[in-house]
Amino acid sequence: MDHIIRHSYTASTDGQSVEALLRSQGYSKSLINRIKLTEDGLMIRGAKVYTTFRMKAGDRLDVTFAEEASSENIVPVHMPLSILYADEDLMVINKAANVPIHPSQGNFSNSLANGLAWYFKQKQKPFVFRAINRLDRDTTGLMIVAKNALSSCIL
């Protein structure tokens, strides 16, 4: 089953385009393009609208899109994770030294992404690895991981 993301925004001025409203909320052009291809992705008063639609003050734009497919090529591996903060949009993780961030040649099953894949599999939640910042393998420090496409765009 797809993970569906829904948001609603209210236009504050007349004449603002749907695309301008979405861009002001942090949506990237690629995410907006994905939403345009989603059935009932952009709706105002129950009617499908295009990104060029000019809104009136008080119009409520309902945005719906399916989250990307899980990062199925990342093998889930149980490993200790130091999660310092988590909400519905992001996680802050204290990355240990000698742990690569993502799988690579010679590191297919010992990366932070592998540990997060296991973490989300245990919670039966979809997982797409979206590291916002990077740290070298030898470096310890805080990593921000976005939990969805919109928070990834904004961060």
Model-assigned labels for residue ranges:
Residues M1-L155:
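RNA pseudouridine synthases
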